[in-house]
UniProtKB/Swiss-Prot annotation:
The name this protein goes by in its record: 1-deoxy-D-xylulose-5-phosphate synthase
EC number: 2.2.1.7
Name of the gene this protein is made from: dxs
Species this chain originates from: Cupriavidus taiwanensis (strain DSM 17343 / BCRC 17206 / CCUG 44338 / CIP 107171 / LMG 19424 / R1)
Lineage: Bacteria, Pseudomonadati, Pseudomonadota, Betaproteobacteria, Burkholderiales
Record flagged with keyword Magnesium: yes
Cofactor: Mg(2+); thiamine diphosphate
Amino acid sequence: MTYALLNKIDAPADLRKLDRRELQTLADELRAYVLESVSQTGGHLSSNLGTVELTIALHYVFNTPDDRLVWDVGHQSYPHKILTGRRERMRTLRQWGGISGFPRRSESEYDTFGTAHSSTSISAALGMALGARTLGQKRVSVAVIGDGAMTAGMAFEALNNAGVYKDLPLVVVLNDNDMSISPPVGALNRHLARLLSGQFYAATKKGIEKVLSVAPPVLEFAKRFEEHAKGMMVPATLFEEFGFNYIGPIDGHDLNSLVPTLQNIRERALEGGGPQFLHVVTKKGQGYKLAEADPILYHGPGKFNPAEGIRPAAKPARKTYTQVFGDWLCDMAAADKRLVGITPAMREGSGMVEFEKRFPDRYYDVGIAEQHAVTFAGGLACEGLKPVVAIYSTFLQRGYDQLIHDVALQNLPVVFALDRAGLVGADGATHAGAYDIAYLRCIPNMMVMTPSDENECRQLLTTAFQQDCPTAVRYPRGSGPGAAIAADLAPVPVGKGVVRREAGARAGHRVGFLAFGSMVQPALGAAEALDATVADMRFVKPLDVALVKRLAADHDYLVTVEEGSVMGGAGSAVLEALAEAGIDKPVLTLGLPDRFVDHGDPAFLLQQCGLDAAGIERSVRERFGLDQPQVTVAPRVA
């Protein structure tokens, strides 16, 4: 497809030069470009195909970047990136050195707020609106938030706060793509949306209230009648109770509805009409039939041929850790009726599809509500059940107070299965599970485990489930090393590691590795070159102090390796144990550096952090001044 109009758009100012009649042609080109780009790089697709018209209308009506536009989560911001000067960089999407898959302030002035975690946009936009007022600047702040993100309490906290400011130029756009509310279509709905957003409606409403104010009972009756009538036209008046003027729902793919409605909304906001709430209904995967039919499959695909669609992948030779968890969850649920499974809106990503099918009465999807998920699990535990919370490491950060106050303080037996621990690749720093070891091990009563392979993951999950205290098992994205997985549900001894490789008896300095989780395999690779000992520590807390002391006694140098923040992580736990025992031993701690690691190929990112086998070996030799291995050069043959 040619992109005659799209190629002319290098900034929203170019978009605003187009005739209104050209916008639909631009939308068709933009949607095709999104599909072409994502099919070549991988990335989020369904959500971006669904926001094409909305993105065009927002940049056409609002004076971005002076008017602030905040995308909640941000995985639906590809059309926004394309229209704001990054069209040619889409080929670098989510790659090392390329553009991010989420809004990023350092990437463009049009990315006014960095997002990736859900439900933050209204708070940020409110802060921007009040910041502009404080500075005496007249602009509109717009938050675009999805219906899924509206399940989080933070969004409603922001709405509750925003409603206090009756004349604030704040706009919230609810992008309802779940189709739970079918959009009224046609001329009547378009007319109603324009009417409810226009000055005539506002002036008439205000005038009637002024007239009827002399007769309070009549005014109260009129207000109740208006609320009842409006409640019949729109799906909810809840947002008006928060102090917003609610408009919609309108068709989010109809530019002839979107543009005039947004124009009226912007005008009202700037003229003191107060916070505005626009409800638009869109369809995930819009315009690409395969994605429309299966938006979940096309939510975040890898590279594929758009003409053929996503082909079923060949069955991998090795199971992913997510699959290992899903299998264990079903097996343990069959063995113990007390088990209940909880996910904050990540059924597929966390491997709970089969569990929901087999045990629907013991499966709870609480929505994007991590705080609630943690405390909800605590409540279940109080009744004698054994909750397992399947959650990404990065998202558990959102329920940290609940983790401490509602679970650990009461020593409730909740299992946290932490998927995506460590680096996650293309999603970048916002989704990396870099901090869980550091933020979990400092909590009293908490047990923290780090499996090094598939079978150990199953064993440690069983071990966690058998405890009478809160536990966490962290495992990485993707496949393990290919260990055979036992069918039983055997645990391992609590707080005990195991030596995977013993150093040889040859002369030289002896190095002992204390490796945690995913770093056991690269440590073994480095150990072959160094002839070092490797201990698979398994537990960060309780740490196997006896094994630490033994390695310290038998080796000249110790090296800790973890795929997590080196500050406050497992290496710090080892150093604390040595200090407590009064042992003075040279220790090198290796892990993720004190910076946010960007997006890119996971193996490449580990290499950049020095956490591949070669990088670990190099760090050990440099730190302890060990000789490089001798390389024998074959004689040249004449």
